[in-house]
Amino acid sequence: MNVALFDYGAGNLHSLGKALEEAGARVTVTSDWKDALAQDALVLPGVGAFGPAAAALPKDRAPVREALAAGMPCLGICLGMQLLFDDSEEAAGQGIGLMPGKVRLLDARIVPQMGWNDVETGLDPIFAGVDHLVAYFANSYECVPADLSDAIAWSEYDRIRSAAGARRANTWGLQFHPEKSSRPGRRIIANFVALAREVS
């Protein structure tokens, strides 16, 4: 199965690409949206700023949004999750808009959130085989889904409860970094690859 790892200047391409390959995916790193949408699945990496990443999206977001809404498997990680939403307080520019909602600054005493945190997961199959998830976070912003039923995982930081995961169709967003979250994180990536293979 061919997975497009989109390159908009995010900093974790190598580790994420390696984790995807270990899960059995053939990874193509690309900054061309036409090429990315021609693959079996799409991964939007994290570590970066919303403004430059949004600027790397096509001016017409509709083809990307429509491909994901039609069922193309996609995994957005950290910044990649934020790009799935409408827009962000961090910078001007529009996200893909697949998941209605906003991205806002964490109202915490210490920002960014850096380090390990408990994640309360639901029954979504992307968490299959993960009994108790402690994941690695590196974020200053949180995703606020307009429809709370899109949220599939939650975490708490400085008494702020935030969506740590969201899903629509075959698109998953994770605010934490599974590629940095030890064995449970690798299992989540393997689950995504398996789920994507089922529909590709």
Specify the residue positions occupied by each region the protein language model found.
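Structural motif
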Residues: 43-45, 173
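Pocket-forming structural segment of enzyme catalytic cores
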Residues: 86-159
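Structural signature of beta-strand start/N-cap positions in the alpha/beta core
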Residues: 26, 41, 73-75, 134
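C-terminal and late-domain segments of enzyme folds
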Residues: 143-200
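Short acidic low-complexity segments
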Residues: 27-39
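Extreme N-terminal starter segment of soluble prokaryotic enzymes
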Residues: 1-4
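Cysteine-nucleophile active-site neighborhood
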Residues: 48-116
